[in-house]
Amino acid sequence: MELSFKNILVVGLGLIGGSILKTIKELNIPLEVYGLDLDEEVTKKANNIGLINNIDNQLRKIEEDCLIVFSVPSLSIERAFELIEDSFNDEKVIFTDTFSSKSKLLEFLESNTKVGEKFVMSHPIAGSEKSGLANYNSLLFKDKLVVLSAVNGDKDNKKLNKVKNFWELLGSKVTIL
């Protein structure tokens, strides 16, 4: 199984976001890896430990195909999107998330329909009682269920399959609603 994008940007570098990045690195998945956190010191720490290529929250524009994963608290989706909105090519991006609660995300997507057209909702059933980047775990998603749903309800769309392949490469079992 191979990925159809060359870059990944994880926005939110806590337990889940950090674990995504650590898994990519340990499995040697061939991606250019970027990360941002609402706390720029966390972004710098992720760079210092070798999880991401960028050194701070100032990204160059990613021109090639990119998966952007929002792994911030769901109430912070608007702020997180503002942080990255100039960092990607609109024609070559797919968005997904790791939120368990989708209500704030759906509100955001209703008022940002262009983003919604490129969004696949993800809910990894994985976690820990611990939080923060310091607790990342490359096995967090192994054999764990990830539930996917296209914003438009189309189960056969290409974006959905690309996100499904991504989670499967991380070791997850994927189901589509």
Identify what each model region corresponds to.
Residues 41-42, 76, 102-105:
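Conserved short alpha-helix immediately C-terminal to the canonical SAM/SAH-binding motif I
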Residues 38, 72, 98:
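Short beta->alpha hinge that forms the Motif I/post-I loop of the SAM-binding pocket
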Residues 1-59:
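NAD(P)+-binding Rossmann beta1-loop-alpha1 motif at the extreme N-terminus of oxidoreductases
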Residues 6-7, 32, 92, 118, ...:
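Residues at the starts of beta-strands that form the adenosine-phosphate
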Residues 141-177:
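Internal alpha-helical scaffold of NAD(P)-dependent oxidoreductase catalytic cores
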Residues 83-134:
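Rossmann-like NAD(P)(H) cofactor-binding subdomain of soluble oxidoreductases
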Residues 60-94:
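Rossmann-like NAD(P)-binding element
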Residues 34, 56, 120, 175-177:
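General small-molecule cofactor/ligand-binding pocket signal
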